[in-house]
Amino acid sequence: MAAASKSLSFLKPLFVSLARPSSSSSSSLALSRARTIAIPNPLFSANSRSLSSVAFAQSTTENGGGGGGSRAIAPPQTPVVEELQRIDVNPPKGTRDFPPEEMRLRNWLFQNFREVSRLFGFEEVDFPVLESEALYIRKAGEEIREQLYCFEDRGNRRVALRPELTPSLARLVLQKGKSLSLPVKWYAVGQCWRYERMTRGRRREHYQWNMDIIGVPEVTAEAELISSIVTFFKRIGITASDVGFKVSSRKLLQEVLSHYSIHEDLFAKVCIIIDKIGKLPLDDIKKELKAVGVSTEAVEQILQVLSIKSLTTLEEIIGGAGEAIAELKQLFSLAEKFGYSEWVQFDASVVRGLAYYTGVVFEGFDRQGKLRAICGGGRYDQLLSTFGGDDVPACGFGFGDAVIVELLKDKGLLPELNLEVKNIVCALDPNLQGAAATVATILRDKGQSVDLVLENKPLKWVFKRAARINAERLILVGSSEWQRGTVGVKILATGEQNEIKLDELE
């Protein structure tokens, strides 16, 4: 197949032994200061005090054979000052650039999101980044409404950058209507925006992985969703000793409040406050509960119950006949069957901040307590009806990209993702640049990646370039070899070198 001896004379001067650089040098771009450009402009005086003086030529032309002469003055050149103002080279606060090294990490993360979703039989969907503001203010909760990036467009419509994906999914389900065959299993990876206080792993712009199941009323849906997240964690090296899931139920909280005679009209407000447990001092939680109308005695009783971490103990306090207790028992039983029981624990204080949750809720957390919620989700059986449709059983979760990257950093689990190009192709003569392009096309047509050297560069530069892009092979196009229909090929890892015919180049 590959012709040629391994000690070809033409290759000896070409494949010099060069040390690979340990790292690539960084470069920076500087913005120019204001600069002045002189352009012809007969409308302005050359000696105007508001402009720089500009020298211009005057020429005198005599008319031949006539009386008197005429002097032609060249129009003055008037300087126009281009103010190249210095701009902040950083992106807006809370947002990010993705240079190649960061983009490789993002692609790796998203690839894992998608592969896990497909393992569980989910199909990918996406939605507009810009949605009607009404989509989020109906049932999202007070916190989300305060964090919206919203404005009025030129058609006098109130719109918002999506702060999450679930309302858009609900809208799409309603749009498809009866053409959908339930149950639906969809996933999405999309950009979201929230104007919130930034902490580590929490930004104003982030990407979010969602998985949702529409049309299944049983708690088996929640159990499978948690299983998918556990599968993702295992794929990237996260263990049950690193991350856990706190599980509870909105129905359970309703039963607790009813047990202590708290009116159901206060439920939404109480949920928002309880969701702050662990984020605010307990005294602040008590003050907020009292401020919405919960009595001092009831506040103490509720907080005592919500501190319980045992489903059995809670069952003894409020009774075990409730629907919420039964669903949670089934969920923990399913966790054993799915094989992730060591990942989950009961925590009555988990309610999630979004107002549309109606049943089981869960939240992934960092066991070391360094980061806020890693992911979270639950059941939202009544969300579609708030948009004008019928009640449809549904549940799902959201998983942000920023916080998981911080967790991987803490655990030393960030992958090394270098640029990898299989071939680097270089012409040894500027006149052979077209031939090198032909070689690159042959390889690309066979599905191989190629970095084509587009300029006339010394071999030392080419070897350094090959090292930086982690190329496997260096392919050199020389004049005599090209006339024979061959190219020089060097395997960079071993130093093996050959002359190979074009039609045998694989």
Indicate residue ranges for each PLM-predicted region.
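Positively charged, Gly/Ser-enriched RNA/tRNA-binding surfaces
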Residues: 2, 6-13, 47-71, 102-120, ...
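Alpha-helical segments
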Residues: 57, 68-81, 88
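Glycine-rich, mobile lid/loop segments that gate access to catalytic sites or pores
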Residues: 244-255
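N-terminal chloroplast transit peptides
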Residues: 1-43
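Active-site/ligand-binding surface loops and adjacent short beta/alpha elements
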Residues: 278
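Short His/Asp/Glu-rich catalytic/ion-coordination signatures at enzyme active sites or charged loops
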Residues: 255-258, 266
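A charged helix-plus-loop insertion that forms the helical arch/lid used to bind
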Residues: 264-274, 285-292
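Polyanion/phosphate-binding surface patch
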Residues: 79-84, 89, 93-94, 98, ...
